[in-house]
């Protein structure tokens, strides 16, 4: 296994560990999710380049679109919660339920 794949797997694992440990704030959770998506994007790009299959080159672009949508929704939720409560705690998300 190449060293770059090991580095990407370590980056994904560290982001996942950060998401599990620092889940009290919305901003830290969003940053960990972005790190995971970045690792998946680089990994899928490398796999698509190594496969040399033309249709596989669309997979990283689709993943990037989903990452952008996730970031936009997460930031809008962060702005809404911080404007309403003045804090970015995940515990405030339970108050949004009807």
From Swiss-Prot:
It catalyses: a ubiquinone + NADH + 5 H(+)(in) = a ubiquinol + NAD(+) + 4 H(+)(out). PANTHER family: NADH-UBIQUINONE OXIDOREDUCTASE CHAIN 4L, NADH-UBIQUINONE OXIDOREDUCTASE SUBUNIT ND4L. It is an enzyme of class 7 (translocase). GO terms for biological process: ATP synthesis coupled electron transport. It is a multi-pass membrane protein. It is found in: Mitochondrion inner membrane. Core subunit of respiratory chain NADH dehydrogenase (Complex I) which is composed of 45 different subunits. Coiled coil: none annotated. Core subunit of the mitochondrial membrane respiratory chain NADH dehydrogenase (Complex I) which catalyzes electron transfer from NADH through the respiratory chain, using ubiquinone as an electron acceptor. Part of the enzyme membrane arm which is embedded in the lipid bilayer and involved in proton translocation. GO terms for molecular function: NADH dehydrogenase (ubiquinone) activity. It comes from Procavia capensis. This is NADH-ubiquinone oxidoreductase chain 4L. Belongs to the complex I subunit 4L family. Its main location: mitochondrion. GO terms for cellular component: mitochondrial inner membrane; respiratory chain complex I. It comes from the Eukaryota. The chain crosses the membrane at residues 1-21, 29-49, 61-81. Its EC number is 7.1.1.2. InterPro entries: NADH_UbQ_OxRdtase_chain4L/K (IPR001133), NUOK/Mnh_C1-like (IPR039428). The keyword Chloroplast does not apply. Keywords: Electron transport, Membrane, Mitochondrion, Mitochondrion inner membrane, NAD, Respiratory chain, Translocase, Transmembrane, Transmembrane helix, Transport, Ubiquinone.
């Amino acid at each position: 296994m190449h060293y770059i794949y090991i580095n990407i797997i370590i980056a994904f694992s560290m982001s996942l560990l950060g998401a599990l440990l620092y889940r009290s704030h919305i901003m830290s959770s969003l940053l960990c999710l972005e790190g995971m998506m970045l690792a998946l994007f680089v990994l899928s790009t490398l796999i698509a380049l190594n496969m040399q299959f033309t249709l596989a080159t669309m997979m990283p672009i689709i993943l990037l679109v989903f990452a952008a949508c996730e970031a936009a929704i997460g930031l809008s939720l962060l702005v809404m919660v911080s404007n309403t409560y003045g804090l970015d705690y995940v515990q405030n998300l339970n108050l949004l339920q009807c």
